[in-house]
Every structure is written in C-alpha cells, then in structure tokens.
C-alpha cells in the first residue's frame, strides 16, 4: 500500500449536530464500524487515524539543516508501535502494543492512586493464556523505494508484549509477566514451536511501566529495563525500577542495578558503559554500573531492596534541560550516515515534547554529565509521540511514533485510538532511500570478524549484529552442543590476537567482547 492510508483530517469531517438523536445513532454506528475494522487488523479498514494523515504529520516536522525525515511505514501495517529493530537481513520489525493498557482475560481487583492494578490471577504464557491483541510484525520494502509495501506477523495473540530482541537462533520476547524465547532456526519467519519460558515474575501492575527495552550487551548478556510502578519478583529477587539482565546460555538472571525512574530505553557506548533513560524531571539518563543503587521516588516506589545499601547514586547531572520529562529510546549514536558531529552524541525521544533531541556526554570523574545540544526532530503535530528509536544497518535513525493525543492511562477504562502508528527514518539529503540488500548469515566466520574489527566502519549496528550471528552459530541455543571445531578455534585465536595486538583500543574491546560472547555462548 504505497499511498496515504485512507483517513480524514478534522477539517474534512462532516459531523451532524450533536443535538440530534438520529445523529447520535449514526455516530455510534460509525464508531462501531471503526472499531470493528481496527480490531480485525485488516489492511482495508476505511476509517483510521483521528489525527493528521501520515504525510501531513511528516510535513509538520522540523530538522537541522542537512537532515531529512521520510515516512517509512504507517497504518495499517503499524499501529501503537512500542519497540522497533532491524534484523540481520535488513528488515524492520515492530512490536505493536495494541493490548495497552489492560491485559486480556484478567479481572481487576483493585487500582490505587498511582494506577497500580491488582488482577485476579497471573495469566498462563502464550499460547495457553488469554489471547491478546499485541503482535510482532516484519515489515517489507519489496521494491526498494524506502516505503513499506507489506507486513506479516511473526507473532500475534500476545498479551502485554513490551520488548523483543534477536539472538541465539530466534527471538526473545517480553510478554509480561514472562520472558519468552521463540526459536526460528530455519529462518522461515515462523516460530519453530511454542515459546520456551525463560523467566517468570515481571510485574504487570501498570502497563506503562512494565519491563522493556530488550537488547544484547557487548558481554553476551540480554539486558532490559524495569519501569517504576510495577514490582517484579524473579527467582526470589524483588525490585521495582532499574536494569536487569539474563544470560541465555547459562540461564542466569541478575538485577544489574536498581533505581532511576520509569525507564524505557538503554544503550552501551563505544567503551561498553551502560546508559539508561529516565522520566525524572530535569534529568536525561543514568550511568548504570553493576551492583549500583540509584535514587527513586521512595515515597511512591518504596525503599531500595538491599537493606545494606546505605546510600545511592543520582542521575547524571544535566544542563539546559529542554522539553517534557519523559526520555524514551535513548541511544548513543554510533553510525556513519549522519554528519560526524552527531557521532557519540546521546539521542533520545521526548514523548511529551513531540521531539527527539541530541545531547553531549561529558566525562565527570568516573561517570558522566550531559548537556542538551539541540533538536534532531521537532514536530508541531500534537499527536506525534515518539516511543522508540534505533539505528539501522545504514546508520540512519529510525523513530517509532505511537501517534495518539495522550499516552498515560489514569482512567483504565478510557477509550484509545488504536488505529494508527508511524515509523520515520532520519537521514541526510544525499542518502539513498534504503540500505543495499544483504544477509549476514551468508558471510563466513572470518568475514563477520572483519565487520567486527573493521578499523574504519563506525556503524555499531554491523558490529553488534555480526557478533550475534557468530553466537547464533556457536551458542548453546543454536542447536546441538558445539564441540571445539577447527572453525571455532580459528575464531577464538583471531579474537585473542586482535585483543592483544590491535593498535586501536576500540578494536581490542570488540575482539574481547566477541571472545567473551563466544565462550559464554557455548554450553
């Protein structure tokens, strides 16, 4: 579907006078037709967004000189996007959070003043629990013009699904209260089986604070954020907000650090420092260190869970705070498409300010301070609500737009416009419409190592995905136990040699991280 979705702006509608009882009947019928089409998820739904059309919303965006934004995808292929990422074949995946804010099939027992909800039971994991509306969709640009032509679901029927990550021959999915693994070892874009339940006990009291932002760290662990107004209890470890991690090959779970805020977004810089976002007013991010404890709104969220933590760290000091107080999808730009001045800058979306900003990260002793740098994208569309952003294979920045007049849910029974959502791509005016087709699985082990150790390439996406492809080939979740074969030994030897002999510190780090990931990735 290449043209604009069929929709109407406010000025184009022809509503009847509200005083007419007959009109009220027609309005109710029209609303019913809208929701029937939306809930069915059909591409041919005639009534869609209440706000601006995708192209009209695009026209409301302002970017720095030399940069441009293009519409990559919109309804009907994308609705309520909460997480996006590019796979090893250069295809964009989107997690559609259509069940938000109430889980399917559960009964509310109690809702407190902070919107924390107690339900009648814990649902069984998919496919045995209540079938929700969330879906994980693969988007396809068949003709290479930079616009999505079609989409198909890798998964549907999910119920409060808030994050996903590729790795180990499949897809990891947060379907609260579970962390699931869906194998797809034949790479046919269909799960090989029902999911394996890896972790149980993520809090589900508040759908806008649940666990989120899955991504693999350079050490081979799978990391995720935890929001503020939910309480998780994983294998006897209870916590509210913070960062947790899971090691797929050894089945270990750890609370990496506790505290911060309602965090939706984390990343690692070129040296491996973990930075995660916050909704704490006046601040941008936290520098997460293993075993660290950070400030919380203690009256609202409770004390730190370690009784021997007699103090805590604060957020990174921030200068020239701008916009709303909710930072989402924060990442360190480590691409080679945007101008060099953006490299190493922290780029994050401002959910309430309808914008995305870039910020300077400055060393401050053993940690960092941040300073607002400027706008990456500012929208004058009040429905533009950036919910996630990521770097693509070509170094472009991809931004998901939740696209709604509001995002919070103080009233759990309020109606929501689930008919729309957009994804935009930020590039330069000289950039091609899309990355050239590729498939990392077709590269040899040594070609993947070339990508990881490339001294010139500044695209962290290629390095990270190449490392994950090697782990897929030799990790314990990729099939039978891998013995020390000649090819595996050759990889380890190259990692060791690069770590010891590299003239570039970044090359030595990349080699060390790959060595650790491969060694821990084996059963």
Tell me the role of every PLM-derived stretch.
Residues 29-45:
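Bacterial N-terminal signal peptides
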Residues 50-437, 442-450, 458-463, 467-523:
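Beta-propeller blade termini and top-face loops
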């Amino acid at each position: 579907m290449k043209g604009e979705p069929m929709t109407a702006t406010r000025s184009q509608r022809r509503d009847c006078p509200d005083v007419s009882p007959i009109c009220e009947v027609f309005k109710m019928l029209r609303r019913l037709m809208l929701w029937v089409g939306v809930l069915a998820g059909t591409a041919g739904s005639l009534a869609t967004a209440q706000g601006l059309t995708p192209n009209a919303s695009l026209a409301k965006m302002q970017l720095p000189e030399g940069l441009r934004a293009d519409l990559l995808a919109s309804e009907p292929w994308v609705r309520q996007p909460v997480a996006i990422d590019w796979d090893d074949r250069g295809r964009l995946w989107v997690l559609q959070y259509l069940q938000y804010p109430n889980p399917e099939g559960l009964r509310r027992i109690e809702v407190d003043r902070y919107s924390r909800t107690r339900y009648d039971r814990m649902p069984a994991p998919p496919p045995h629990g209540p079938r929700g509306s969330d879906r994980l969709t693969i988007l396809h640009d068949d003709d290479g013009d930079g616009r999505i032509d079609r989409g198909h679901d890798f998964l549907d029927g999910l119920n409060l699904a808030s994050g996903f990550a590729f790795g180990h021959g499949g897809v990891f999915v947060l379907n609260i209260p579970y962390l699931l693994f869906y194998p797809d070892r034949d790479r046919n874009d269909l799960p090989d089986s029902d999911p394996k339940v890896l972790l149980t006990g993520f809090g589900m009291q508040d759908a806008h604070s649940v666990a989120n932002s899955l991504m693999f760290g350079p050490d081979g662990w799978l990391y995720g954020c935890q929001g503020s107004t939910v309480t998780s209890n994983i294998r006897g470890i209870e916590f509210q907000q913070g960062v947790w991690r899971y090691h797929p090959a050894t089945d270990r779970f750890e609370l990496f650090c506790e505290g911060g805020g309602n965090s939706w977004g984390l990343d690692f810089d070129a040296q491996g420092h973990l930075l995660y976002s916050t909704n704490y007013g006046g601040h941008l991010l936290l520098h997460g260190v293993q075993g660290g404890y950070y400030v919380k709104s203690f009256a609202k969220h409770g004390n730190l869970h370690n009784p021997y933590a007699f103090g805590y760290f604060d957020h990174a000091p921030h200068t020239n705070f701008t916009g709303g107080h909710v930072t989402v999808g924060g990442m360190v730009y480590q691409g080679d498409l945007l101008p060099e001045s953006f490299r190493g800058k922290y780029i994050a979306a401002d959910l309430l300010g309808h914008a995305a900003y870039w910020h300077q990260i400055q060393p401050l002793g053993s940690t960092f301070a941040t300073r607002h740098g400027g706008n990456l994208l500012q929208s004058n569309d009040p429905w533009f609500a950036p919910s996630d952003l990521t770097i693509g294979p070509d170094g472009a920045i991809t931004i998901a737009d939740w696209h709604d007049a509001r995002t919070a849910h103080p009233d759990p029974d309020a109606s929501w416009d689930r008919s729309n959502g957009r994804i935009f791509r930020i590039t330069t005016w000289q950039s091609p419409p899309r990355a050239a087709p590729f498939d990392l699985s077709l590269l040899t082990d040594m070609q993947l190592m070339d990508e990881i150790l490339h001294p010139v390439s500044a695209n962290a996406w290629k390095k990270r995905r190449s490392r994950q492809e090697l782990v897929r080939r030799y990790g314990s979740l990729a099939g039978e136990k891998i013995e020390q074969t000649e090819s595996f030994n050759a990889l380890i030897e190259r990692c060791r040699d690069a770590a010891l002999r590299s003239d570039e510190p970044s090359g030595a780090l990349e080699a060390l991280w790959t060595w650790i990931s491969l060694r821990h990735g084996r059963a």
